[in-house]
From Swiss-Prot:
Gene Ontology annotations for the cellular component aspect, listed alphabetically: host cell Golgi apparatus; host cell membrane; membrane; viral envelope; virion membrane
Topological region Virion surface: 25-48
Record keywords, A-Z: Disulfide bond, Host Golgi apparatus, Host membrane, Membrane, Signal, Transmembrane, Transmembrane helix, Viral envelope protein, Virion
Cellular localisation: Virion membrane; Host membrane; Host Golgi apparatus, Host trans-Golgi network
Signal peptide: 1-24
Role of this protein: Envelope glycoprotein necessary for proper maturation of gM and modulation of its membrane fusion activity. Also plays a critical role in virion morphogenesis.
Intravirion compartment spans: 70-87
Subunit structure: Interacts (via N-terminus) with gM (via N-terminus). The gM-gN heterodimer forms the gCII complex.
Primary location class: virion
Keyword Chloroplast recorded: no
Organism in which the protein naturally occurs: Varicella-zoster virus (strain Dumas)
UniProt membrane topology term: Single-pass type I membrane protein
Name of this chain's protein: Envelope glycoprotein N
Transmembrane segments: 49-69
Length: 87
């Protein structure tokens, strides 16, 4: 757990303090995370409509899969406890 926290802090520090401007030079004057030079490379925040639909469809699929796995696990535990109980 400690190595995950250390890695997270290291990555956050790199994002916040080593942003580059358009010329490729480190921009220490603007250490604002929301500055355009600090945005992720190759990942657009405002995507097209198809990208948005694909994202939400994927998110819905993951949610349905997690809910079905949780339901299956609870149903299996309930069935096992009912079969072991004596009436």
């Amino acid at each position: 757990m400690g190595s995950i926290t250390a890695s997270f802090i290291l990555i956050t520090m790199q994002i916040l303090f080593f942003c580059e401007d358009s010329s490729g030079e480190p921009n220490f004057a603007e250490r604002n995370f929301w500055h355009a030079s600090c945005s992720a490379r190759g990942v657009y925040i405002d995507g097209s409509m198809i990208t948005t639909l694909f994202f939400y469809a994927s998110l819905l699929g993951v949610c349905v899969a997690l809910i079905s796995l949780a339901y299956h696990a609870c149903f299996r535990l309930f069935t096992r406890s009912v079969l072991r109980s004596t009436w």
